Each structure stands twice: as structure tokens, then as C-alpha cells.
Curated annotation (Swiss-Prot):
Membrane topology: Peripheral membrane protein
SUPFAM superfamilies: MOP-like, P-loop containing nucleoside triphosphate hydrolases
Subcellular localization: Cell inner membrane
Name of the featured protein: Spermidine/putrescine import ATP-binding protein PotA
Source lineage: Bacteria, Fusobacteriati, Fusobacteriota, Fusobacteriia, Fusobacteriales
Organism listed in the record: Fusobacterium nucleatum subsp. nucleatum (strain ATCC 25586 / DSM 15643 / BCRC 10681 / CIP 101130 / JCM 8532 / KCTC 2640 / LMG 13131 / VPI 4355)
One Pfam family this sequence matches: TOBE_2
Reactions mediated catalytically: ATP + H2O + polyamine-[polyamine-binding protein]Side 1 = ADP + phosphate + polyamineSide 2 + [polyamine-binding protein]Side 1
Family to which this protein belongs: Belongs to the ABC transporter superfamily. Spermidine/putrescine importer (TC 3.A.1.11.1) family.
UniProt cross-references to NCBIfam families, sorted A to Z: potA (TIGR01187)
Signal peptide per UniProt: none
This protein's encoding gene: potA
GO MF entries: ABC-type putrescine transporter activity; ATP binding; ATP hydrolysis activity
InterPro entries: AAA+_ATPase (IPR003593), ABC_SmlMolc_Importer (IPR050093), ABC_transporter-like_ATP-bd (IPR003439), ABC_transporter-like_CS (IPR017871), Mo/tungstate-bd_C_term_dom (IPR008995), P-loop_NTPase (IPR027417), PotA-like (IPR005893), PotA_ATP-bd (IPR017879)
Principal cellular location given in the protein's record: membrane
């Protein structure tokens, strides 16, 4: 298969006077598994359909390799698309559904047999070749659509929320298979999803979109651990947000922040700040330790606070705690912990709701997500 990268340059698109895409610039490397995520209506599917050739941009360019494909019809773009709906032919069996693109090209029968069997084996359906598609599960039908797309040997495979119609267990299994298939064929995959966990678990890089704009591009770890702004931080998983002012620059790595309702804490300096700057801190629920007894600080950059447990929710592999500060009921924290962490080292009593407790977190676990300098 011929590998192609995608370069999207200054792309804009409006419908009925409403701008859907705003100055989109993206470079997707050949062979990447690249995910585009964002809330409904953010423009991610419009962008995918634009790459496929179903929609034309109002301005800008889309390069497939060195060629600007904006004016090329879909059938000449060397790009295949897999949609949420499988679009299979119910009157054809599995073999003929996968063979259909080759029959359109009038490929000889020997090659068709070799290629269809090759791609059915790739998606694990070689033993189902004579079955009607109606006899197969939703996950199997989606794998047929993947095989049919790949048999065309596209330079880029576009996947428009292909797993959203499946149940959670099947979705997870097919996600793993998609990753293995991508490793096998080595072409560029562009994956559209609203499921953040899907994107985080499978992607080489992720673009986060909102309101027609690309807010951040990075590896899963980069966008999760170092979000560009509060929207990205909030969209990718759960978070706690707090506002305050910089009171002291300790060194190049650490600063003291006076957080509203908490008091002075220590935070890692991920951005340049100066004393007096207003800041927003994000703190992931899984980064916080909850204890029945106050934990003695072993490091001078640990933060702690006394809290009251409002709610406890058991959710299988972890438990979720919702607490508020003892001295400020309006300031609430979400805390997610693995079950081994439910017990205090001293008395091994579980923490439930309607109890006093203590929270601690490392200065390096919080993230300085936004900075607003004081106006002079």
C-alpha cells in the first residue's frame, strides 16, 4: 500500500453563514494513527468528509503527499472511508462484499480470490466468507467494512466514529483489533471519535477540536497531562479546577499559589508566571490521595487539606469520592482511587461518606493550565 501523509493548510468552511471550520492547520504524518476528538458539532466530521472529498473547503488546501487534492473527486483521492453505518450489501455474502471494489476495477478472478482471502484473514473472518452479512454480529460486520476499505490499498483510511454503534465490550475488542490492523498495514489512519478513552488508548497523536478550531495536537500523554487550556483539560477525563494568584516564585520549577478557599499551595511551573498573576490550576482526581488520618509531609512540596466526604461511589476497579473542604463547603474535590488505596496505613479502616478525612497531592501533580497577567 502506498503511504501518504496529510497536510491541511488554512482550511475554512461555512454553512448558511455559520463558520464550521476556522483556519484549520494539521500535519498528519504517513503511517500515523491520528485521532480527532471533540464534542458534537465541533467540526471533526466535516473535516473528515473534506479530506474524503465529499465536502469542499471555502478556502485553504489539503495535501495528500505532495498533491493538493481539493479539486479531486473522492474516487481519485486514494482515500477510503469507513462510516458508523457499515453500508454493506445485504444480498451479497461476506466474500463478495469484500471483493466488490476489485470487481468494479475488473480485476482478474485469481487476484480477487487471493486479495479477498488475505484481507478476510487480516480481520479474522476467513471462515465466514460464504455467510450473508445478516448472519454476523455488528462487530463482524464492521470488520467486513474494514477489509473492503483496505482491499483498495488506500494511502489513507478515514474512520468516522466506526465503533459508536457497538456495545462497550465489543467496542473495546474491536479497538484493539483496529490497532493491530494498523500495525500490520502501516498506512495512515485518521480516526474520528467523541470517546476520549478510545482516542487516548489507540492514537499516536490526537487533535482536540472545539467550535471549529483545533485547540491542541499532541501525544495522548501530552494532551492529558499538559492540556492547552481548561476546555482540553475538562474534555479529556475528569478534573478539579481552582483559581488563585501567584504569591512567590520558589525556583525555576516551583511557585506558591494562593488558591481561593484553600490557601497557599505549591505548584510546578509549566508556564512562565510572575507574582500577582491570576492562574487556573487543574488537578486530576486520580492524582489525589485520600486518608482517614492526616499524613505527615515527607516532602516540602506536598499539599494537604482537611475535607469532609460527601459521597462515595463504588465503580468496579476504582472508587470515587466527592468531598468538600472543612473550612469551605463550596470548594469541592473529586477523588478517584484504586481499591488498595482505600485503607489508611495506620488503622486500615475504609473511608466512607459523611466522614472527616484528609487529602494530599504532590506539587508536580497539579497543572498550571491558564495564566492571566495583571494589567498595569
Amino acid at each position: 500500500m502506498e503511504k501518504k501523509d496529510i497536510n491541511i493548510v488554512n482550511v475554512n468552511k461555512s454553512f448558511d453563514g455559520v463558520q464550521i471550520l476556522k483556519d484549520i492547520n494539521l500535519k498528519i504524518e504517513q503511517g500515523e494513527f491520528f485521532s480527532i476528538i471533540g464534542p458534537s458539532g465541533c467540526g471533526k466530521t466535516t473535516l473528515l468528509r473534506m479530506i474524503a472529498g465529499f465536502i469542499s473547503p471555502d478556502s485553504g488546501a489539503i495535501y495528500l503527499g505532495d498533491e493538493n487534492i481539493v479539486n479531486l473527486p473522492p474516487n481519485l483521492r486514494n482515500v477510503n472511508t469507513i462510516f458508523q453505518k457499515y453500508a454493506l450489501f445485504p444480498h451479497l455474502n461476506v466474500f463478495e462484499n469484500v471483493a466488490f471494489p476489485l470487481r468494479l476495477k475488473k480485476v482478474d478472478e485469481k487476484t480477487i480470490n487471493e486479495e479477498v482471502n488475505k484481507y478476510l484473514k487480516l480481520v479474522g473472518l476467513e471462515e465466514h466468507s460464504t455467510k450473508k452479512v445478516s448472519q454476523l454480529s455488528g462487530g463482524q460486520q464492521q470488520r467486513i467494512s474494514i477489509a473492503r476499505a483496505l482491499i483498495n490499498k488506500p494511502g489513507v483510511l478515514l474512520l468516522d466514529e466506526p465503533l459508536s454503534a457497538l456495545d462497550a465490550k465489543l467496542r473495546q475488542n474491536l479497538l484493539i483489533e483496529l490497532d493491530l490492523i494498523h500495525d500490520e498495514v502501516g498506512i495512515t489512519f485518521i480516526f474520528i471519535t467523541h470517546d476520549q478513552q478510545e482516542a487516548l488508548s489507540i492514537s499516536d497523536r490526537i487533535a482536540v477540536m472545539n467550535a471549529g478550531k483545533v485547540l491542541q495536537v499532541g501525544t495522548p500523554a501530552e494532551v492529558y497531562e499538559a492540556p492547552a487550556d481548561t476546555f482540553v483539560a475538562d474534555f479529556l477525563g475528569e478534573n478539579n479546577f481552582f483559581s488563585g494568584k501567584v504569591t512567590e516564585i520558589i525556583n525555576e520549577e516551583l511557585a506558591k499559589i494562593n488558591l481561593e478557599g484553600i490557601g497557599e499551595i505549591i505548584i510546578e511551573l509549566d508556564k512562565k508566571v510572575k507574582i500577582g498573576d491570576k492562574v487556573t490550576i487543574s488537578l486530576r482526581p486520580e492524582k489525589i490521595k485520600l486518608s482517614k488520618n492526616e499524613i505527615k509531609k515527607t516532602k516540602n512540596y506536598m499539599n494537604s487539606a482537611a475535607v469532609y466526604v460527601d459521597e462515595y461511589i463504588y465503580s468496579g476497579f476504582q472508587s470515587k469520592y466527592y468531598v468538600h473542604l472543612k473550612n469551605n463547603e463550596k470548594l469541592k474535590f473529586k477523588i478517584f482511587m484504586q481499591h488498595a488505596a482505600f485503607f489508611d496505613d495506620n488503622d486500615e479502616k475504609a473511608i466512607w461518606w459523611d466522614e472527616d478525612a484528609y487529602i494530599t497531592w504532590d506539587a508536580y501533580d497539579g497543572y498550571l493550565v491558564e495564566v492571566e497577567s495583571e494589567k498595569k
